[in-house]
Amino acid sequence: MPLLDTHSRVTHRPEPGFALLALVQATLIFTITLVAVPLPLIGVEFDLSTADLVVLQIAYGLPYSGLLLLGGSLTDRFGGTNLMRTGLWTFGLASLGAALAPGFDTLVAMRGLQGVAAALVAPAALAQVAALFPQAEDFDRAMARWGGISVLGAAMGTVLSGIVTTWVSWRWMFLVPGVVSALALLTERWLLPKVLSKDRGQSLDLFGAGLALVGFSAGGYGLAMGSETGWDAPSVLAALVLGVASLTGFAWHERRADAPLLPADFLRDKGRLAGAFGIFLAAASMGLVTFILAIYLQSGPGWSPLATAGAMVPYLAVLILGGGPSGQMVIGMGTRNAMILGLVLSAIGLWLLAGFGPNYVVEILPGLVLLPAGTSLVFAASAVLMTQGVSPVRMGLAGGVMNTAMELGPTAGLAGFMALASLRTEIEAGWSLVFMSAGGVAFLLAVSACFVLKRLQVTGAWK
């Protein structure tokens, strides 16, 4: 059984260390959406097709989601400190490379390398949080806040990218994750405990990691490109078949592997499974809002990038102001009730956004206020559900699964919902159908949570 050697250099309150980890986590999610607003400008500079822009959009999320389970396994084996340092160095250098990219191919490669690095950092950061808050009650409170941090990062990417690209080049956006990486590397020695694993003898499931990477990447690519090039395109069909085959092989292999990346019994817990679905849907909803509104406001009413970013400020404000109360509500009213309330609010917000139009105050703003209020609760409750009952030596696995759900939302989830838009001849009618459908899924999950989480209990640490 792995042992965790946690030698803390933190002699004061853990809040500064948690703040640093929160900044890192928000930046990892921020990096997903930082290209949302400047995509048209990048397309003009490099003379890109719509399909090229889709590739650029998903180049970060696909390796991130595909390698997170391996990142969790590496964290449990080598410890959060070593993995986070390695990941931050790589993340920072890749961000600098993206800022200086001379062409499209280099930019896509650097976005992909950012995703690889993020897959190391995310589960390692969660292991550090567990070391900062060793008491179960304190850790649950921390995780309730942690869930809201991720959704905040996504909204900040959309808002800041619009502001930055209005005044300077889009390339400056990639310096933000580079600066955060440097700050974390300079300060973690004094703010964070040293988390090292003593058991390095257990073999790594590299074959399973390869299947997961190919499955998530190929499947996500096929879903993303299907709506652009057509679902009958040979490249799309090949990617989807490869993705399904790889993920099927992954599931079969994990049930038989000696040291699986994702032990079969981990997601048998109803709470963890509900948390994974909640995170996936909330992340997909966020992706829908930022993607659709960023395109609509610039191509429909003809708003500037700065005005488009300004349109998302209320969304960001609700996330900032609601982050603390959401965590308190999860602890006060319980994860089940918080999850149900959050899903219902999210559903109503998405349904309101289905009526989007040029009148921002009447047709967009109400949904932009209600949706983040709901997703904040969903993320906070889901983060607690995903980590309750997990022993500290397996927190890397929990972080890997949680962040995989987070990354699949804006990639595979977004692509899956956007595929529904092709059922309508008019693009705006298709987008309205997407919002309605996402709201329907959120409401169905809320109803399901009423029964699935009715007798939720934590029976002990998952080892």
Feature locations, PLM:
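Membrane-interface helix termini in secondary transporters
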Residues: 41-43, 72-73, 77, 163, ...
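Extracellular/periplasmic helix-loop-helix junction of adjacent transmembrane segments
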Residues: 36-67, 106-107, 301, 306-311
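12-transmembrane solute porter fold
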Residues: 14-37, 50, 167-168, 234-242, ...
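Central cavity-lining transmembrane alpha-helices of secondary-active solute carriers
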Residues: 58-72, 122-126, 313-326
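Structural signature of transmembrane alpha-helices in multi-pass secondary transporters
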Residues: 21, 28-29, 57-60, 64, ...
